[in-house]
């Protein structure tokens, strides 16, 4: 069906810039052959635009993906070079195709924190980027590790968001008697868990309290959090009352209040009941349109865009709230001049 809401800002669209992709193809062929080589719209702009043209009004905020985290395959020096290459090229694409790409989110060398803070500054101040992109775990370290605090402080000062993308490789087995994950469990079910774990570390570490201006955007609609709202309330509450709580009890807000501070995209492939669950937890103001384009879809985003747009249209909410999800929230969150 044709949407009545013309402007739709895909706030979490994935891309692998062509020059950056060429480097990965030559220097990291395993990653290229596994994912990038099977998904042309990541780096083939005409093919990408062909899909976008099927959905009038769709524009994109660019995020690099979906190879494993930069720090997982590049050393601290090389990751700086690759991050700069990707960010420079995304800036060129935004400048060249302003009617397609309204902004970009910076890739950072997270295994080199001094350089990551400087690259965030360069990307935002010099290139005009509207946020930064990190994974749910940094080479096995949680996001509340003290070494990452300077980056959070800087982003709080910029008043621009941190995008969290889940990561759990197939080398992380579900059972200690096995060496690898099977049946795509790591990504299909592990990624929502990793998102939830990262959110929880940010909540209970006090980072969201320490930096109240910090804004965090999750992928795939906030992982498990909205589904487990009552479990969060009951278990954390009962453990605190019984004296068995293993988390700080001096935070001024309840845990659920901190979870409600996150922003979340709609990239769950068109499930209206699940979107309504997220809506009841976060409200329309903390949801942004996203379809995981061009991933998770054998048609490289064609099906996911259709499913996601139709699912939002079918939500039992007001037209003004749908408009917020499709565009207004991204305009506000990213401070876009569209």
Predicted regions and their residues:
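Short glycine-enriched loops at secondary-structure junctions
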Residues: 15, 65, 110, 166-172, ...
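Divalent metal-dependent hydrolysis catalytic cores, especially in the metallo-beta-lactamase
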Residues: 32-41, 47-74, 101-109, 130-134
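A short acidic, glycine-rich active-site loop
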Residues: 33-42, 80-81, 186-195, 243-246, ...
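Aromatic- and glycine-enriched glycan-recognition loops and surfaces
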Residues: 38-46, 84, 88, 141-152
């Amino acid at each position: 069906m044709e949407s009545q809401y013309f402007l739709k800002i895909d706030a979490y669209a994935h891309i692998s810039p062509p020059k950056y992709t060429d480097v990965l193809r030559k220097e990291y062929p395993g990653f290229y052959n596994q994912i990038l080589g099977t998904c042309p719209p990541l780096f083939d702009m005409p093919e990408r635009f062909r899909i976008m043209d099927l959905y009038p009004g769709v524009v994109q905020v660019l995020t690099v993906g979906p190879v494993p985290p930069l720090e997982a395959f590049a050393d601290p020096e090389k990751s700086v070079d690759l991050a700069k290459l990707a960010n420079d090229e995304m800036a060129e694409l935004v400048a060249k195709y302003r009617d397609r790409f309204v902004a970009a989110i910076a890739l950072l060398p997270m295994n080199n924190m001094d350089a990551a803070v400087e690259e965030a500054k360069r990307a935002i101040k010099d290139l005009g980027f509207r946020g930064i992109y990190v994974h749910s775990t940094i080479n096995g370290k949680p996001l509340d590790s003290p070494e990452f605090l300077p980056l959070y402080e800087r982003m709080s000062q910029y008043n621009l968001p941190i995008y969290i993308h889940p990561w759990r490789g197939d080398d992380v087995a579900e059972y200690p008697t096995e060496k690898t994950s099977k049946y795509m469990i790591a990504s299909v079910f592990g990624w929502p868990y990793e998102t939830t774990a990262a959110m929880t570390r940010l909540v209970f570490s006090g980072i969201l309290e320490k930096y109240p201006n910090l804004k965090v955007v999750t992928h795939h609609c906030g992982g498990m959090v909205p589904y487990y709202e009552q479990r969060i309330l009951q278990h954390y509450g009962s453990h605190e009352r019984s004296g068995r709580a293993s988390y700080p009890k001096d935070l001024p807000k309840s845990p659920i209040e901190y979870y409600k501070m996150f922003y979340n995209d709609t990239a769950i492939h068109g499930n209206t009941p699940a979107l309504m669950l997220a809506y009841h937890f976060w409200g329309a103001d903390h949801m942004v349109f996203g379809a995981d384009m061009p991933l998770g879809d054998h048609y490289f985003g064609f099906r996911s865009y259709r499913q996601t747009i139709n699912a939002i249209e079918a939500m039992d909410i007001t037209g003004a709230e749908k408009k917020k999800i499709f565009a207004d929230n991204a305009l506000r969150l990213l401070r876009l001049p569209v």
